[in-house]
């Protein structure tokens, strides 16, 4: 209730038996209380908006820095950046801002560590956002099927600045570097590469690309990709796989993320992630790897 401070102040003024002056003082005190509460509300929503804007901005800055670190930005890099913008529903001015951020990240002296520290401070207590950010960068790094030494170095910097332990990050890398995973990413990169030439302008000269994206071929998940999604090994037992599934669903289920006041764009990403987790678990069950 927006005016409870004034009502409370008025009530206290009445019961104080000081007459009209008591009621006036009570109203004034209540007004100050209401203003303080309104200010805190505005600060909270401003912080939420700032955090989400910073998340998107840093995502594409780091993405540009990561892809440029290997010498040049490839068509596969442009492809994955475009797909990320689509997944985040960044269109119009938001898309142009993301493309500018991508170009900023490609600059030779881009202050990556400083930007990452700002993001970590803004996401304090929100490891779900940190993990989402890291997953995006990993997908970008492995999109062409080969992890360049410079990309690996940048990924270590990202993990370090975001507070991800070396052990956790090495496990993520092992899953991404599996032979089956590399082959599937190479195949997808070859299939999508030809369709991306006309998209490059938005990332190189500041203009948005035109034309419609051709439909991507449907690719079913494999046991290997399902294991990567759940963060397990094919040799893990049913209990371990089920525990990993439940943990991931607890982190990414949209119903639980509603209380965290994520933006609609992030909620959509969480929904898709939950669907991927569910599909991976069902695939492993159907493959008789779980009971």
Swiss-Prot record:
GO annotations of cellular component type: plasma membrane
Entry annotated with the keyword rRNA-binding: no
PROSITE patterns to which the protein is assigned, alphabetical: DNAJ_2
Pfam families from the UniProt entry: DnaJ (PF00226), TerB (PF05099)
Biased composition (Low complexity): 181-211
Domain comment (free text): The transmembrane domain is a dimerization domain.
Entry function: Regulatory DnaK co-chaperone. Direct interaction between DnaK and DjlA is needed for the induction of the wcaABCDE operon, involved in the synthesis of a colanic acid polysaccharide capsule, possibly through activation of the RcsB/RcsC phosphotransfer signaling pathway. The colanic acid capsule may help the bacterium survive conditions outside the host.
Protein name as it appears in the record: Co-chaperone protein DjlA
Organism encoding this protein: Pectobacterium atrosepticum (strain SCRI 1043 / ATCC BAA-672)
Gene: djlA
């Amino acid at each position: 209730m927006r005016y409870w401070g004034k009502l409370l102040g008025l009530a206290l003024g009445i019961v104080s038996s000081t007459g009209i002056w008591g009621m006036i003082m009570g109203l004034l005190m209540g007004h100050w209380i209401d203003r303080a509460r309104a200010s805190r509300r505005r600060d909270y929503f401003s912080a939420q908006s700032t955090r989400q804007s910073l998340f998107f901005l840093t995502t594409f800055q780091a993405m540009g820095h990561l892809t440029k670190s290997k010498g040049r930005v490839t068509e596969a890099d442009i492809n994955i950046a475009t797909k990320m913008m689509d997944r985040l529903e960044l269109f119009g001015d938001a898309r142009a801002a993301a493309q500018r951020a991508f170009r900023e990240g490609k600059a030779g002296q881009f202050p990556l560590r400083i930007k990452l520290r700002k993001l970590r401070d803004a996401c304090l207590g929100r490891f779900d956002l940190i993990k989402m950010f890291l997953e995006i960068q990993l997908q970008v790094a492995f999109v062409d099927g080969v992890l360049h030494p410079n990309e690996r170095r940048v990924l270590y910097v990202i993990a370090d600045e975001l507070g991800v332990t070396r052990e956790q990050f090495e496990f993520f890398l092992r899953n991404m570097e599996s032979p089956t995973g590399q082959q599937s990413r190479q195949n997808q990169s070859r299939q999508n590469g030809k369709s991306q030439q006309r998209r490059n302008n938005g990332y190189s000269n500041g203009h948005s690309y035109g034309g419609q994206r051709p439909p991507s071929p449907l690719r079913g998940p494999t046991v290997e990709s399902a294991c990567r999604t759940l963060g397990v090994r094919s040799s893990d037992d049913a209990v371990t796989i089920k525990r990993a599934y439940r943990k991931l669903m607890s982190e990414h289920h949209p119903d639980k993320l509603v209380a965290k006041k994520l933006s609609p764009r992030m909620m959509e990403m969480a929904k898709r992630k939950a669907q991927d987790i569910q599909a991976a678990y069902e695939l492993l069950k159907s493959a008789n790897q779980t009971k």
